[in-house]
A protein has these predicted regions:
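Hydrophobic residues in well-ordered beta-strands that form the structural core
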Residues: 17, 57-58, 82-84, 214
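Glycine-rich beta-alpha junction loops
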Residues: 1, 89-90, 112-119, 167-171, ...
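Contiguous beta-strand/loop segments that form the cofactor/metal-binding neighborhood of enzyme cores
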Residues: 149-220, 249-257
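Beta-loop-alpha module in the N-terminal Rossmann-like domain of NAD(P)-dependent dehydrogenases
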Residues: 2-74
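C-terminal helix-rich "cap/oligomerization" subdomain common to oxidoreductases
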Residues: 31-33, 250-293
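Active-site loop of classical SDR/Rossmann-like NAD(P)-dependent oxidoreductases
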Residues: 237-249, 265
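Predominantly a Rossmann-like dinucleotide-binding segment in NAD(P)-dependent oxidoreductases
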Residues: 91-161
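Rossmann-fold dehydrogenase core element
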Residues: 70-87, 106-109
Length: 293
């Protein structure tokens, strides 16, 4: 509670709680953010929706499609908003990339690499297992890192016609690294992720006329270049804020203007991502405990 008290004082929050159910009874706020371990998104979001609160839900949306569909139905039933903190599609430079896609000609390849060595992997090697490395908490590199890459690819090109996910698993059953290969008409998207190696964070979209290159991951999207036979052009714009802030701005706009259409568009995108994640896990034989509930 000491941390909660300090946080509340720093941000001018009138109250703080150590009882979630009691907090949801309060009427001085209308929105809950579920920044929790993956498997807890569903039960905590469900309680908030049933209490009549809007929910900003952390990525990945939840453990599986069954949970996703139930939460969406509850948001409609209680006439509240349910929006994923995707940190990708609200970025100004995502819009820039989308607007320049047509200048690349027919797309022939998409490659995204997201390697980020986890300090918790060191703990794992020493016998201490973090919840991000367990099926109990719906962990793994697909849910933690590659979800951004999937969101980016699906937002630009839609769902793939086919996919395969090849992984290296820990003894706990989750994917510590993996390569997700998604087939689209005319091209293949290859998304690689790792939590036990030091490597690149970059993305390329290759077309017959040119390439869009970015030396950051999809949740950041800075320093974006378009490369053609005529040369290299920096097309990215300055972003004053990070992806979290831009997503919060968008959620506030949707709620303040009661923009149901925009809310449904975001939910449709989130469901496509969940479909890809679930298919990828099935391909790799990854089963979360939530899948059996």
């Amino acid at each position: 509670m000491a941390k909660a008290a300090a946080f509340a004082e720093n941000y001018g929050i009138p109250a703080y709680f150590d009882d979630y159910d009691e907090m949801l009874k309060q009427d001085f706020f209308d929105t809950v953010y579920t920044g929790l371990p993956n498997s807890l998104h569903y039960p905590y979001a469900k309680k908030a929706l049933c209490a009549g609160k809007n929910v900003l839900i952390e990525k990945p949306f939840c453990s599986n499609l069954a949970e996703f569909d139930e939460l969406v139905n509850l948001s409609h039933e209680h006439n509240v908003y349910l929006i994923e903190m995707d940190r990708v599609t609200s970025l100004p430079n995502f819009g820039v990339i989308r607007d320049h896609l047509g200048e690349l000609g027919p797309i022939r390849a998409v490659t995204i690499d997201y390697a980020q060595y986890s300090r918790k992997y060191d703990d794992y090697l020493n016998g201490k297992i973090s919840n991000v490395f367990t099926t109990e908490f719906s962990g793994g590199v697909l849910s933690d890192l590659l979800v951004y890459c999937v969101n980016y690819t699906v937002a630009l090109f839609g769902k793939p016609t086919n996919l395969i996910y090849v992984v290296d698993k820990l003894s706990t059953g989750i994917d510590i690294s993996g390569a997700l290969v998604m087939k689209y008409p005319g091209f293949i998207a290859t998304l690689t992720g790792s939590k036990n190696s030091i490597g690149d964070k970059r993305s390329t979209i290759q077309g017959e006329w040119g390439t869009i290159m970015c030396d950051t991951v999809p949740s950041v999207l800075k320093d974006v270049d378009k490369v053609t036979r005529q040369g290299t052009e920096r097309i990215s714009v300055y972003e004053e804020y990070d992806g979290t802030t831009y997503t919060l701005f968008e959620m506030k706009r949707i709620i303040d203007n009661d923009d149901r259409a925009a809310g449904e568009i975001r939910l449709a995108q989130s469901r496509k991502v969940m479909e890809v994640l679930q298919s990828a896990r099935k391909s790799a034989g990854i089963v979360f405990e939530a899948d059996n509930r």
